[in-house]
């Protein structure tokens, strides 16, 4: 039998959910609600629930983790039905342990049922990212190491995924190809000399504004030695 090791204590972070994240969420919410409700809405809820019925539900965590996505949940229900109110009892970036209430959602039962799965999908996905990142951050705590993210995100989800990384205590790297230079093996191969790292760094630095960082990935000690001659960022 294998002895299970206790998970590392998860850190808490407090990133800001800005209008940029809200705009990104709005587009995803629109697509998600259209995907789930189609043109005819929630057939089951409308068939079984009186349109005047009012109620309250709690959103609760069932495991340890880092919360992320509560503002998206509120935004989703506001988009679905402006009569719905969401009151949070936790915050994004907060590490939670024992199962408890993260938020309460009030009013039209039809709307609560129509939006619950989509809201939980957002909350679960983003909290999962934040929790996994926090676990890695906890492992390297005290070493001076930062945990950075990449561009390997689901299309359309990058802004929110990177927000979730920040909620987990990770560090956002470039948002896209537009806001930084990262020289990779394919760039070096495309130039015809995979070992000429310093030359690529110098060429890139001369070609872009000074405000853009120029960074490089290396696979070997030889590449690292060559790259350091050009002092990449």
Question: Where do the protein language model's features map onto the residues?
Answer:
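Acidic/glycine-rich phosphate/pyrophosphate-binding loops and surrounding catalytic core
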Residues: 2-230
């Amino acid at each position: 039998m294998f002895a299970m090791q206790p998970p590392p204590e998860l850190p808490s972070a407090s990133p800001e959910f800005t209008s940029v994240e809200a705009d990104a969420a709005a587009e995803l919410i629109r697509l998600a609600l259209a995907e789930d409700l189609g043109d005819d809405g929630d057939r089951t809820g409308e068939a079984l629930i009186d349109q005047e019925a009012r109620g309250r539900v709690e959103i609760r965590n069932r495991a340890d983790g880092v919360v992320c996505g509560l503002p998206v949940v509120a935004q989703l229900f506001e988009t679905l039905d402006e009569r719905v109110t969401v009151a949070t009892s936790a915050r994004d970036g907060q590490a939670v342990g024992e199962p408890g209430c993260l938020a309460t959602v009030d009013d039209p039962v039809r709307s609560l049922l129509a939006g619950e799965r989509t809201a939980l999908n957002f909350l679960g996905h983003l909290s999962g990212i934040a929790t996994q990142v926090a676990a890695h951050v906890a492992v390297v705590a005290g070493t001076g190491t930062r945990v950075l993210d990449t561009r390997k995100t689901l299309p359309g989800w990058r802004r929110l995924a990177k927000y979730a990384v920040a909620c987990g205590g990770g560090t956002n790297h470039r948002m896209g190809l537009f806001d930084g230079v990262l020289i990779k093996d394919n760039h070096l191969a495309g130039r015809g000399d995979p070992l000429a790292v310093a030359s690529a760094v110098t060429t890139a630095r001369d070609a872009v504004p000074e405000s853009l960082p120029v960074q490089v990935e290396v696979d070997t000690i030889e590449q690292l030695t060559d790259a350091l001659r050009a002092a990449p960022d």
